[in-house]
């Protein structure tokens, strides 16, 4: 980050924009109350948090920068200061422009006007300590010095000021040259012009020190002349900052992590040139979006990318039924276990214990079936697992929009399912800072530059990301210069954002029956829409150079409460919407953000590119220099009507429905569900399908979960996870399927580039991507098109 700041300094990427190069001097020394009230009347409107809705959640803290007061001044001060930004929300790489207004109630000498754009990271230490303390680090800083001569007068404010002396009614303009009049000058160019006009001589040196000394002497000489003494009035200084393209977005995870940006302005002034210097400081907060506009436009045109997940569960009959029935069955099992301990020769009671054996299929007695009267359980319950396939239509979701799920449920045992539970979680992973002992033992000199401790810039380069994965999440390892055993562990904080239970009796009203060679299977399908609340933040978090390295992830968990351990985790990439036309809507009317409604689907692209119903009149946030929205609208008009109609028909059905007035949602056509194969009937098979040995009392039958064939113990002794089928636990497969696993792993890690010709086909189902692990998608932080 230090290198980035130096590059900005050398390239003069922080220009100052000046509209007029003259100073108006007006003699006003009395009646300071009227200018003060007028100065307060032009204060900008109070800014709101861009992602928090005050109508749905408790009010958030006023600002994430509460530790830094926005004004350091006293009442009745001679010099008052105010910062007015053109707007409050910016994107990476954008120019921040605004004005600094200085109110002088008496004649003063302004010596320096300094601006500083700073980025802060507030990290809470509750993961390390019992109390909820925090540390604040400054990870970005950009400075800009404005010469006092670069002023643009607000004539409307000066005309209303009282004038004590009638002889000074006309303003006095400072003499300026033709080259500097009404032009935009940098502070260096203005200083050189002033140096050429000054009558004083400077000491001549060689090299760079000559120019530096001449500039400093010219500034010091100009400060000693009466030209820098300003009369009472309101003085306006325009400025502009150029943001870098890789800044962390503004966020406020309350109680965990906060990133905020402030524009500080400090003015040094005095009564005279030899009087004691005084200073006044004022700050203004702004919000920066981490989403690149090009990538956001890219998402608008590529919204049809979906992600699908599948879960298969080999059920145990003890987990079926209601709570009462399950308790009765557990009591019966406990009684049977006690009888087994007392009577070792009682074979009838041992039948229940054999049902828990996962290595081979078993049958259920009539007594056990009677304990679950509400559920029809077949004898081959192990060969008919319950399966659920879920398709998330859009992997990239926006805050305030709806996430659409398509669900297909295969229930061969006709289990009674009353509801489906949908949960949204936010997971924040932290890296602990080094302890004081470790920090002082290595690189003690570098720690002095850190604000409040933490990891220095020289140590950040030693942080390496491990390729290994643990529980689906990445781990970051810190390697110390002196010891490789000092590795910081990841601290994870998981918060539940929303919880909804949907009634399945209405959702699964329409059931489709798929016929096969042996039997008919019932397949239930439905769709759900979940509105992502505004109280959540996006997951586009950038690692900073101070404090912790943090990652934020969001995921859905869809489960069936009546079935234990039947949960499916679906990761989602969450984005904050920052359209050019919606800056005012986001800040002033949060609940009017554009999102899908249940009764108005229509054109998908238009619903995502609309500017909302909020009006942007009378607000400074409506100004924008971007043309990406105009480009998006032009591209939208050029789309072919036939392609647009085909795009809409892919997900929506316009057929009339008396029971439902809204449009029907259709799953993507590319979504193909790979269900588990049907087990072969072992009663009609006497030999192993691979070695052709005859089954006996010792050589028992086993089924392959990947192909459904019947094999002996020697030909089906391998166990793997069938991720393509949704089986996350290791199950038994045959040797032929195991060879396909090895062939797939040798070609590709995720199995995406494997040749399907080398994989066997069994029961008409290819085994491609069956054993491959689900790919973990990571949202790109910045995409160059």
UniProtKB/Swiss-Prot annotation:
Positions annotated to bind Zn(2+) 2: 704, 707, 734, 737
Zinc finger (FYVE-type): 682-742
InterPro entries: Arrestin-like_C (IPR014752), Arrestin-like_N (IPR011021), FYVE-type_Zinc_Finger (IPR052113), Ig_E-set (IPR014756), Znf_FYVE (IPR000306), Znf_FYVE-rel (IPR017455), Znf_FYVE_PHD (IPR011011), Znf_RING/FYVE/PHD (IPR013083)
UniProt KW Zinc-finger keyword: yes
Zinc fingers (RING-type), renumbered ranges: 688-738
One Pfam family cited in the UniProt record for this chain: FYVE
Residue spans of biased composition, Low complexity class: 173-205, 435-450, 608-633
GO molecular function: zinc ion binding
Ranges where the record places region Disordered: 29-69, 172-205, 326-367, 435-486, 608-642
Keywords (A to Z) from UniProt: Metal-binding, Zinc, Zinc-finger
Basic residues: bias regions: 466-478
Keyword flag Transmembrane helix: no
Xref: SUPFAM superfamilies: E set domains (SSF81296), FYVE/PHD zinc finger (SSF57903)
Family, similarity comment: Belongs to the arrestin family.
Protein name: Arrestin domain-containing protein D
